[in-house]
Amino acid sequence: MANPEGRAGVPRVSVKQGDRMDAQRQKSAVAWLSVISNTTLVAGKLIVGLSIGSVSVMSEAIHSGVDLLAAVIALFAVKTSNKRADDEHPFGHGKVENISGTVEALLIFLAAGWIVYEAIHKLLAPEPIGAAGWGVAVMFVSSVVNIGVSELLFKVGRETDSVALQADAWHLRTDVYTSAGVMVGLALILVGEQVLPGADLLWLDPVAAIAVALLIVRAAWKLTRESGRDLLDASLPPGEIAWIRERVSALTPIVRGFHHLRTRKAGAARFIEFHLVVDKDLTVERAHHLADSITRDLKAHLSEATVTIHVEPCDGSCRPACLEGCLLAAQEREAVRAHRSADTAAAPKA
């Protein structure tokens, strides 16, 4: 059967027990790093923003505050989603990560609204900015720190298939863009004071803040869409579904067909179920071993997969759903139907 490595949308290998523990430690470590870095940046931006009276720096402090809250939520989600399934949650706790991503997106929307409100207030009643150079410096440091931490979050988030970490990474990545925008706005004010002394350039600061808000609203919408998909039990990505079909189809002729393939995802966990059609003369024992073999194969390549297979006999009735996933050639189907008709005719009438 085809090897899924390198196929778009298909994880290379499943996570074994030892590797899962290492992955969990990695996830917790980078989540804690995000909390610590955001705490430091919030303090720095607040001090500088209040000192120089810059609404754009203050808006960035609020943005980093939201990032800090998101980082704490991500840390909670990472720890909770790793809990084993129990009687109350038989499918596990994976959706905690999806809920985390949705909440983080809503927090970004709220932060954007506050930034726009404050920026409009500053446009209508501008206030002088003192020591804009400090604002430029703190925005530069913020950008550098967030680039490093967000890259690490993206890396671990993709490797461990963590929705919460990737959502946290998007928070920090938007902070990079917004910090750069504020830095440019303050730098223009600094340069303008030297080149055009007396010119009114204070409007640049709130305009930069509004541009910041528009950028993070765009990121929030994308994050809401992505995290909401799994909450609504959307199917696995097309690449993964195509690979599952290819994997099962490769088992013909022992497998006559399959249908009613349904998939969904909760955090990093995948749930796959389908009806497997086999020869009607196959013993229950052999059919059971076949289903077990397919389950092991899918679990070996799809991370944290739970596979449910319903085995049914190929009796030649060829219902519409069965025909859709039939692996037999037309001639073979006719032979099965003929055999079924012969059996029916030979059966004693009641």
Q: Language-model segments: which ranges?
A:
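Alpha-helical transmembrane cores and adjacent cytosolic helix/loop segments
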Residues: 2-239, 243-246, 339-345
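Histidine-centered active-site/metal-ligand motif
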Residues: 63, 89, 93, 171, ...
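Conserved beta-strand segments that form the floor/walls of ligand-binding pockets within enzyme
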Residues: 101, 139, 273, 277, ...
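Short secondary-structure junctions
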Residues: 249-258, 300-305
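A short interface-forming secondary-structure element
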Residues: 271-289
